[in-house]
Each structure stands twice: as C-alpha cells, then as structure tokens.
Design a protein with these regions (language model features):
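Extracellular loop-to-transmembrane helix junctions
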Residues: 47-152, 273-276, 280, 474-482
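A generic transmembrane alpha-helix motif of multi-pass inner-membrane proteins
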Residues: 392-405, 433-522
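Membrane-interface "cap" regions at the ends of multi-pass membrane proteins
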Residues: 1-65, 78-82, 493-522
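TM-loop-TM module centered on a large, flexible mid-protein loop between adjacent transmembrane helices
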Residues: 99-101, 106, 137-148, 218-223, ...
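C-terminal membrane-solvent junction of multi-pass transporters and transport-like membrane proteins
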Residues: 26, 157, 169, 186, ...
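Helix-loop-helix junctions that connect adjacent transmembrane segments
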Residues: 23-27, 67, 143-157, 186-317
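Helix-loop-helix connectors at the membrane interface of multi-pass transporters/channels
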Residues: 4, 98-102, 129-160, 194, ...
Length: 522
C-alpha cells in the first residue's frame, strides 16, 4: 500500500468516526472535493445575485454612503464564520447548524435551531428564485410571459419564472450529489470570472472618485429618531441579505472528502471572496454611474439599469446573463443546504414523516423525498407571497430567522467556553485564546443585527398602500409565531418520537459494547 493510499484510508476511517460519534452510520456518498465545498458556500452567498437584487434598496435608503455597510457586515459575519470554522472541524456532519447545536446544548435548542434554519432556507429558496424577474426580461422581452397590461404582470411573471427554476433545482438535487456539484462548480467558476470582468469594465468607466462613498446622496433623515444613522441601519439590509449562508460549505460534510480540513477553509474563502468581489462591484458601480440621482437606480433592478447605461446593450447583456447563471446556482445551493438540514433532522425522527424524508434513493444516493417536498413547499410560498408587501415581510423574516439560528449556535458555544468544556479538534481549526473574544463579538453582532432586521419600520415592512399594522410588526410577529408554534409542536408531539431512524442508526459491534455488560447474541 502506497503512502497516498494509506493516507486516504486513514482519512476515510476518520470520516466514518465523525458520523459514528452522533450514532449514525454512513448513508450519503462521499464524492465532493475542496472546490465543490467552496463552491457551495460562495454560491449560497452569490455575489452577483445579492448585489444586483438589492443595490437599489441600499442606494435609495442611504445614498452612496451605504457602501460602508458592506465592510461592516463582513467584519461582523467574519466573527460568526470563525466560530463556525471551529465547529466544522470538530463536527463535520450534515445539517451543520442543527447538529452543532445538539452537541453544544440540548435536544430542544438544537431542534429550534434546525427548525428556524429550515423554514428560513425554504423561504430563501423562493425569494432567490424571484430574482430572475429583475434580470431575464432585461435580457429578452420574451421572458415577460404575462402581458404588461395585465394587473400585477411583473409579480405574476416573477412567480412563473421562479417556479420553473425551483422545479429545475429540485430535479438536479434529486438526481445526484455529483451532478449538483458539477453544475454548481461550473456556475460558480463562471460567476467569479464574470465578477472580475465586471469590476474591470466598471473601473474603466468611472466618472467620479472614491470619495463618493462619503456622500449621503441628499437623503432626508430629519424625521428619523437617529437621523442619518437610522437611514444607514435600514440600508444595511442590502448587505445583511447577502453575506450569510457560508455554513453551507459544512452542510455537505458527509458527502465531502476530508471535511475536517476542507470545510473551515471553504467557509472562510467563500466569505472573503464574496466580500472583496462584491465590495469592488458596488464601489465601481457607484463611481461609474452616469447620474446617481436617476430614480431608476433606486428602483427594483437598479444595478441592472446602471450596467446597461455604463456598458451598453451588448456587453451589458452578457453580464446580465452571468447574473442569471449566478441566480440559478445560488438557488441550487440554497436548495441543497435545505435538503441536508431536513435530512439531518428527519434522520433523528425530528420532523413529521421523518422516516420518509430521510430515505436515501438507492439509485441516486440522495434524499429524493426531502428534495421534492422542499421544492413543493417553496413553490406554494411563491403564490402565497404574491403580494409585493407580503413578499417583503416574508423574505425579511427569513433573514431574521437565519440570524436567530446562528445565535442558537454561538450562544451555547460561548457557554461551553466559559465553563471550560469546549474542546476544539486538536489537529483541526482552532481560534486558541482568541476564541472567547471572537465568540462574544459574534453574539453581540448577531443580536444587534437581529433587532435591527426585526425593528418595525414603515419603509421596510409597510412601505406601500394599503398600510396594515400587522405588516409593520411582521418582523416580530411572524418569527414569533413560527418559532412558538414550531416549538410547541416539538415539545408536545415530536420530542416523544425522537431517536435515530433504524435505517441510519449505527450498528454496534461487540467492540462498541461496554465490557461490564454481556454481549447479546443475535
């Protein structure tokens, strides 16, 4: 046996031990390399999807100075990501958030973390798919299937495009991890190239200096309790909505080779590349815009309009095609992460019909039932949130719940650090003595941003007629209902059924049985 073969065998044995620690047996096929895990993380964040979808909101809320929210959010999310890197190295298993919380706290907290993340991921799947409407009709008017003279034509057309995309992601995720990873990796490669090309093209066409990022754009913040700071906190939504989901790189741990080392690297690389490329796109877009006071730039599809203004129809259209590719692979990654989380929870029989949801297809090696179920729920959500007002509320609470899920990991982790019971993997990623301050900053950041996201602002939750008080308080009410109702169901019904489903339970060998007890014969 060569040294490489021996190392591979040792790594495979270690991979199996990581799953064995949770009482599971290996069920998923390990076929993903380091680039695949990196691609999963960066495609979930998706630089082009997020910046093109929300540039208009940031610019319209706080002017060009909103750009500073990008590095600010990066620093805050980096604190969270560093904590996750330790966890990814220590517990490389599917459904990262859920299983990490289970090891850090108790079954109730872990279920709540998983439920929060799962519901938010399904909503995000629908929300990301709707981003096609802002780009496809700009490329070719034929993508506007609904005549413009029809009431709510854009919203209805967006639902149709989004539903078609979700059908696609459902089929790809159901037909095999390798196929999903190949499409995702190819899409990410193209997205990264397009992002670099876009940065260069915008830099060539700048018409003002970088000092523009200190300009508030004449935003009238006189009526706000915090003045311009209040406007900036609202504009931060445009960055907060983008830089999350980096934990997806660790959600594929049971399908990855050597996840202990690959997952932490993938998490940090995904966040870093997104920060650098996204930050430069936003900066040069602001510097190259012909007229920053153009109302079209502060309307839905603002960055798409800017690109066509600056680069012209031909080159601009090519960039917009790259944006569409980014949206597709982003939705593919969001769907994949939701499937792994549903699989992890149902494997513990912690979801209704858990034994069905965690079934692995012998043909494709994937949880097909979970893939299809999540796709159907997301498509139903598209029609439920048909109203732009309701859509804004629902997508906003998805981000609130993701930040809440992160807190349900970082807070128990801090408790273990303070108690001295947290032990990172000796040969894996470790923050060392920086672990405590980084963990504290991650919690402070997550808590403050959760409050900021949920604050009942008219301009976010109740921006257009008809005005309703319950929409304005939607960021508080809906997460409360989802968390409260979900946990009530778990506490009264599901927790009494909790236990690893037989299909995925570790099979004990005589060596696993304590020596003070007789070995039971079959």
């Amino acid at each position: 046996m060569t040294s490489d073969e021996k190392a591979h065998k040792q790594a495979s044995a270690a991979d199996a031990e990581d799953i064995d620690e949770f009482g599971y047996k290996p069920s998923l096929v390990r076929s993903l390399g380091s680039f695949h895990t990196f691609a999963a993380g960066i495609s979930y964040i998706s630089i082009l999807t997020g910046t093109f979808q929300l540039f208009y909101f940031g610019l319209g809320s706080a002017g060009p100075a909103y750009w500073w929210s990008w590095p600010l959010v990066f620093v805050g999310q980096l604190m969270v990501a560093l904590c996750f890197c330790e966890l990814a190295a220590r517990y490389p298993v599917a459904g990262s958030i859920y299983n990490w919380s289970k090891r850090l706290s108790n079954h109730g907290v872990s279920w709540l973390a998983g439920w929060t993340m799962l519901t938010a991921s399904i909503v995000s799947l629908a929300a990301v798919a709707l981003a096609l409407q802002a780009t496809l009709p700009e490329i070719w008017s034929g993508f506007q299937f609904i005549p413009e003279d029809v009431s709510n034509a854009e919203a209805l057309n967006g639902v149709i495009l989004a539903a078609l995309l979700i059908v696609f992601t459902t089929l790809i995720n159901a037909f095999g991890t390798k196929l999903m990873a190949q499409i995702n990796s190819t899409g990410v490669f193209l997205e990264l190239i397009a992002a670099v090309v876009l940065i260069i093209l915008l830099a060539i066409n700048i018409v003002r200096g970088p000092q523009i990022v200190f300009d508030t754009g004449g935003i009238d913040a006189s009526g706000r309790p915090l003045g311009y700071a209040g406007a900036f906190l609202v504009a931060m939504f445009a960055s907060l909505y983008v830089m999350y989901g980096f934990d997806t790189a660790s959600s594929l741990a049971e399908e990855s080779h050597d996840p202990r080392r690959n997952a932490p690297k993938a998490i940090l690389r995904a966040l870093f590349f997104s920060f650098v490329l996204g930050g430069l796109i936003l900066l040069f877009a602001i510097m190259s815009a012909p007229d920053l006071s153009d109302p079209a730039l502060s309307s839905l599809g603002g960055l798409q309009t800017l690109i066509l203004q600056v680069l012209g129809g031909g080159v601009g259209t090519v960039i917009l095609i790259a944006v569409v590719i980014a949206v597709v692979v982003c939705d593919l990654a969001v769907h994949a992460a939701a499937i792994r989380l549903a699989f992890a929870m149902s494997r513990d029989n912690n979801l209704p019909a858990g034994s069905k949801l965690c079934t692995i297809s012998p043909r494709f090696g994937t949880p097909v039932v979970s893939s299809v179920t999540i796709g159907i729920i997301a498509i139903v959500l598209l029609f439920v949130t048909f109203s732009p007002q309701i859509y804004t509320v629902v997508t906003s609470i998805a981000i609130i719940m993701i930040y809440t899920a992160y807190l349900l990991v970082t807070i128990p982790m801090l408790v273990q650090r303070v108690r001295g019971t947290w032990q990172p993997r000796p040969d894996g990623f470790s923050l060392g003595r920086w672990g405590l301050p980084v963990n504290i900053l991650a919690i402070l950041w997550g808590g403050f941003m959760t409050v900021n996201l949920a604050w009942p602002r008219n301009e976010v939750y109740n921006a257009s007629e008809p005005f309703h008080w319950y929409l304005q308080w939607g960021g508080v009410l809906l997460p409360g209902v989802i968390l409260g109702a979900g946990f009530a169901y778990y506490w009264t019904v599901q927790r009494h059924k909790t236990g690893v489903v037989a299909e995925h339970a570790r099979v004990e060998t005589p060596a696993d049985v304590p020596t003070d007890k007789p070995v039971q014969e079959a």
